[in-house]
Amino acid sequence: MKKTISFLMIAAMAMIVSVSFTACSSDSDTSGNVEAYQEIVDNQVKAQKASSKKTKALLLVAFGSTWPEPFTDFDNTIEAYKSAFPDHDVYFSFSSAICRNRAAAGEHVEDLNAPKRNYYAPDIWLESLGRVEYAEITVQSLQVIPGEEYASVVACLKGFANNTKNDLRNEYLKNVKLRMGTPLMADPDEDVENLATELHKIYSQYANQGAMLFMGHGNPDDLDIFSANIRYTQLEIALQKKNKNYYVGTVDMMDNFKTDVLERMREAGYNSGKVFCAPLMSIAGDHANNDMAGDDDDWKFNEETGEYEDTSWKVFFSETEKVKNGYDCSDETMIVKGLLSYPAIRQLWINHTHTALNSEPLEWYHSNDGTE
């Protein structure tokens, strides 16, 4: 049943993406060196496939980051996937051009001693995998919900399947087995409950002391392509069945900003005490370090959204004068760790990959020359 649900879910998402997204492209890389990047990745893939002799490839796709801790989380995730899928060559990609460019430039080399890293776009990796003609290619999204970023990943794979660069053999594309692993909370029932269970194991020590807040990303209403913002609400409900002190808010979801979380806390009678915060994101990058745990205190109120957009969660929940919160919320109550840093949660993504591999291949191929 899980296999069937997953297959139907991806098929439905693909139909939506075909209307909302027409392409996934590396053209937004500001350096203009797309051809050079393609050559670099081509050489890496050729060398890997020649060495391993494997016929199956697995491409992990994260949004990306420029912070050192996420780099470590990504490295550990790659190694975990290599161990879990020894018959696959494992590759890794950033979907964000901004993150790719900034990581390559070494945005945090001086202030955080972060290394320069070269990551490449999913469409470049897929093109290279196709050029050496892997018999099976599985793409695993490392997103938390099936939102805007996941849509771009689906668009990448659809573009590859339909030979948008028009340089792969139609006979190959007709026969290659393509699969897609869904985000962490794709399914509203099993996925949400599985994540709630693992989060409770990790964070119950904090929920037992005070309010335990998770900051997700979310999508603005006009970009909530798969109506997946509701996963955050569903997760809060699942978590509160385990401990009433859990709350789940977001950066971008309307009616679920930190101001909305505060309102729910007050309605529940939690008006003082400790407030712990952790990112509900695959890694702890800019949002976790700045929007959640930073010192931004602009206090400019957006009347349309009802949010203090440039005030961090830490500052907001510790404020005593402007909004009279006065909770015990400080550097000591910030838990700046991404979900991929926890092996048990990383395993949930791996489970999604197993589900994809046990599902029927996606039937997305349509040749450019009119033949099937």
Where on the chain are the PLM-derived regions?
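Bacterial N-terminal signal peptides that target proteins for export
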Residues: 1-10
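Active-site-proximal alpha-helix that buttresses catalytic centers in soluble enzyme cores
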Residues: 26-372
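C-terminal motif of bacterial Sec signal peptides marking the signal peptidase cleavage site
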Residues: 19-23
